Amino acid sequence: MSINATARSLLLTEFISAFFLTMRYFFKPKPTINYPFEKNPISPRFRGEHALRRYPNGEERCIACKLCEAVCPAQAITIEAGPRRNDGTRRTVRYDIDMVKCIYCGLCQEACPVDAIVEGPNFEFATETREELYYDKAKLLANGDRWEREIAKAIELDAPYR
């Protein structure tokens, strides 16, 4: 062992340099957030939990065109259309999304001609059972009613890119 190596090991230079490096980072502001209590802002293009929207008069937007069902690569959407109404329009009788299969690609949202199906701002929807991840029309409409303000704002902010 050389004299230089012996001096370095006796004086603990590596230990001291590592200690000062640690102290330098110890007093800097932390780059992480305290997650459950603080949340980062999400992008207007964020794709979270699905929702069905309504028109301002309360009528559901979905016209049962089944484009979202056709374009879904995971085949997670099931739609049954009701009979035509007197005014010639159709509405859905059944609108189910299997969130276990869903890959959150956003193709259903892009395919919808009336902005009925959207992916909302919620990303915290963990459940205890798989059955809770099978969303029916009532659950999707409730999600849409709950987040209508946030969804409308996100669509407005994203309008130049559509």
Curated annotation (Swiss-Prot):
Binding-site residues for [4Fe-4S] cluster 2, renumbered to this chain: 72, 102, 105, 108
Membrane topology (UniProt): Peripheral membrane protein
Requisite cofactors: [4Fe-4S] cluster
Positions of [4Fe-4S] cluster 1 binding: 62, 65, 68, 112
InterPro entries: 4Fe4S_Fe-S-bd, 4Fe4S_Fe_S_CS, NADH_quinone_OxRdtase_chainI
Domain 4Fe-4S ferredoxin-type intervals: 52-82, 93-122
Chief place of localization: membrane
Keywords, in A-Z order: 4Fe-4S, Cell inner membrane, Cell membrane, Iron, Iron-sulfur, Membrane, Metal-binding, NAD, Quinone, Repeat, Translocase, Ubiquinone
One GO MF term: NADH:ubiquinone reductase (non-electrogenic) activity
Biological processes, Gene Ontology terms: aerobic respiration
Residue pairs linked by disulfide bridges in the UniProt entry: none
Catalytic activity, EC: 7.1.1.-
Protein name, per record: NADH-quinone oxidoreductase subunit I
Organism per entry: Nitrobacter winogradskyi (strain ATCC 25391 / DSM 10237 / CIP 104748 / NCIMB 11846 / Nb-255)
Annotated gene: nuoI
